[in-house]
């Protein structure tokens, strides 16, 4: 698993949006944002290695990207925080985003 993470971190382009959408439609990617905006954890369950790779590629691409949000700038991506877990059903990627005061 660590090899996969290191490989994906070397990829500098975003996953094609249509690929992500197809994976979601097929149920290969499901995600559950933490409803508590103070913590900002999002868990992505990936049922295939392809889905896992697409999630990591996209998160890596989005790291450092900013968008305005209620007087704050929301920073998406890893911020050095990524956990992976493998169980009988899926690979789970837990990513973190935070808020930076404008």
Task: Give each language-model segment a name.
Residues 1-3, 99-102:
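Short intrinsically disordered terminal tails
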Residues 30-96:
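Acidic, low-complexity, intrinsically disordered interaction modules
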Residues 9-10, 95-101:
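Mixed-charge, Lys/Arg-enriched low-complexity segments
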